[in-house]
Each structure stands twice: as C-alpha cells, then as structure tokens.
Amino acid sequence: MATLETRLAEMLTPAVEAAGYVVWGIEYVQAGKHSILRVYIDSEQGISVDDCADASRQISAILDVEDPISNEYTLEVSSPGLDRPLFNAAQYARYVGEDVKVQLTMPVEGSRNLKGVIDKVEGQMLTIKVDGKTLVVALDNIRKGNIIAKF
C-alpha cells in the first residue's frame, strides 16, 4: 500500500507542475491532534513567497475536494531552502560530492545519524564517505536526509 506522502504526491503533482513548479517532496508530520503537511516546491528560477502562496492556493483547493487526511492539519508550502531535504535517489544523485546529514531508521556502523559526503548512488543504495570511511546505506533506511549548506 502506498504511503500517504506517495498518494499526496500523485494527487498534487499535476496541478503544481501546471502552475510551473516541481514538487520537490512532501512530509506529513503527526503532532498530537494537529498535524503538519509540508509540501516543498522548486523551479529553475527559484521560489518566491508569492510562488508559495500561489501553489498553496492550488494545493488547498485539491485537498479540500479530495480530503485525503482525516484529522486537522496545517498546510505549509515552501522552497526546499539551502539545507534542502532529499527524498529520492535522483535527488541524492544530483548532489554527489556535497555534504549531507542523514538520520537512519536502523543503525549503520553503530550510528543512526551520519554526516558525510555523498559519493554515489546506485539503484536504491547511497554511498557516503563519513570520517574517512565509505558506508553504503539503503535509501529506504533513511528516515530524513538534508544537504548541509555551505556558507
């Protein structure tokens, strides 16, 4: 069975793309009685506050009709930002050579939190260099991954 995020992506992507944006990723965070639905959008030109407001109106209209979430939630639409979250193999592959931090579901080498450099992505496996060690992590073992912004 598809996850809620997958179903939401299938539902929202056509309208978001028709408006000129790309759905970078979707997070649904349950926080007691009130949850948060985060939709990250991107485009070649970057994303402005007006773009987020425009996409939010489009997304809200779809969610009001389809009603895929039964409990109360807040919709947040934003750009992925400098420390952008990574959601799939293509996104990790796009940032080969960049610093990344990942939170794992199951520990690798005794750790659930890794910081390192993305070495390569093959299929659904991420190779990351952490403190001189090369580690291979299954993408489905990554709970959360983010680029580490360089200033």
UniProtKB/Swiss-Prot annotation:
GO terms for biological process: ribosomal small subunit assembly; translation. It is found in: Cytoplasm. Its main location: cytoplasm. The keyword Cytoplasm applies. Keywords: Cytoplasm, Ribosome biogenesis. Transmembrane segments: none annotated. It holds the Pfam family DUF150_C. The keyword Thylakoid does not apply. InterPro entries: Ribosome_maturation_RimP (IPR003728), RimP_C (IPR028998), RimP_C_sf (IPR036847), RimP_N (IPR028989), RimP_N_sf (IPR035956). GO terms for cellular component: cytosol. Belongs to the RimP family. Required for maturation of 30S ribosomal subunits. This is Ribosome maturation factor RimP. It comes from Shewanella amazonensis (strain ATCC BAA-1098 / SB2B). The gene is rimP.
